Amino acid sequence: MAKNIAVLVSGGGTNLQALIDAQGRGELGSGEIVAVISSKTGAYALERAAKAGIEGFVLPRKEFESNRAMTLALVDLLKGLNIDLVVLAGCMIIFTEELVQAYPNAIMNVHPALIPSFCGQGYYGLHVHEEALKYGVKLSGATVHFVSAECDGGPIIAQKAVEVRPDDTPEVLQKRIMEQAEWKLLPEAVKAFCEDRITVDGRTVIIK
């Protein structure tokens, strides 16, 4: 049975593009991206969606009095679109528990580090890679996980390690992790979900 996917974004949408490309190659199983929802007007991710013929929506954070008000509006929109899977792809909003309650084990996020390292409140974008380099790790990578009420705390679906090199800058490491891990892991996880190959037992995710 086909599954409707909504991708939530705030910026350029490089992970969205990886999903669009995978969809074009028939690599999302029975899943179809039917909506791209941005928290910012003018986000380039909306242009990516338009070029792919995917409907775009904008829910500007500044128009809502609180994150909860925005979350409730988002849930209404998702339900109206009959969404089965929500993917956070560079979305900078911390949604409240109502979203998780509406979509238990049906919201995926990609994080640019190997959780539980360099994750949680405040760890996003280049800052993650700055902290990894500052700590001196030899491996970093990416994690795709289900979203829970705890920031970056949901069950881990997939991880991929990426080498950290002595001359890396945060920007160089970010690019390598995107290319070698994020853009591969996320479409694979979405495909597994859409093919009903994922089961969750407590904190353990099993992919058949």
Locate the predicted segments by residue.
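One-carbon transfer enzymes
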Residues: M1-K208
